[in-house]
Design a protein with these regions (language model features):
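A hydrophobic alpha-helical transmembrane-helix feature that marks the membrane cores
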Residues: 1-234
Length: 234
């Protein structure tokens, strides 16, 4: 079942779509900035690092909390208030910052910054393509989803195998996958923006937050894959 509402009777103009997409990108940017700040702050605060990484229970508890927030936002957005949806997205972004704070310990600041710039360029190019192309990308959805499941399973298996070859295979395949997902998701969000009633501020905010989460996940995962390739370890 499609989690987005269908409003075929509502004719949305170009202004409504542009407003929706602007809010999607705006909230995604806010989420990324919050994640970056929390990650940097945690990495420079020993007490926070001890709290996050001294216990596997704490670390994996944070991971589970992140997954729960994604499922709640994705599956229950219509039942949430606009304020609650925004709060949950901000909470998710902050928790992601905590779990990713170790990259500031593992990699040099300059390589993190350069990887972020490259990620931004790749993401921007593919998102622009997804928004402007006349080609229907919906046919790639099944393949991209299967690829996503594949790299998740391979990553879990590699926790035990500890295979460097498998790790690099997952990394390079992951780059291709999230580049594709960026274009696919952007086109999907564009279609959603043409269907929802953007004149309703609550509806606009809730689906902008959900769209922001979608593109945020694409960006973060693409960044992490590229950081493995481009990052200079300390």
């Amino acid at each position: 079942m499609d989690r987005y509402p269908r409003s075929d009777s509502i004719v949305q103009g170009r202004t409504g779509l542009q407003t929706y997409m602007a809010q999607v990108y705006g909230w995604m940017t806010v989420g990324l900035l919050l994640t970056a700040f929390i990650a940097w702050f945690a990495a420079n605060t020993p007490a926070v690092m001890m709290f996050v990484f001294s216990s596997k229970i704490t670390f994996f508890g944070l991971i589970i909390a992140q997954l729960a927030l994604v499922f709640v936002l994705s599956g229950m957005v219509q039942r949430l208030s606009a304020g609650m949806a925004t709060t949950l997205f901000m909470l998710y972004s902050a928790l992601t910052g905590l779990t990713l704070s170790s990259i500031f310990i593992a990699y040099t600041y300059s390589s993190i910054a350069s990887t972020f710039v490259v990620t931004g360029g790749m993401f921007g190019a593919m998102s622009l393509y997804g928004y402007t192309t006349k080609r229907d990308l919906s046919g790639f959805g099944s393949m991209l989803f299967k690829g996503l499941i594949g790299i998740v399973l391979a990553s879990l298996v590699n926790l035990w195998l500890k295979s460097e070859a498998l790790m690099w295979a997952v990394t390079y395949i992951g780059v291709v996958l999230f580049v594709g997902l960026t274009a696919y998701d952007t086109q999907k969000l564009k279609n959603i923006g043409e269907q929802i009633d953007t004149r309703d501020s609550a509806t606009l905010r809730k689906y902008s937050i959900l769209g922001a989460l979608t593109l945020y996940l694409d960006f973060i995962n693409l960044f992490l894959m590229l950081l493995r390739i481009m990052g200079n370890r300390r």
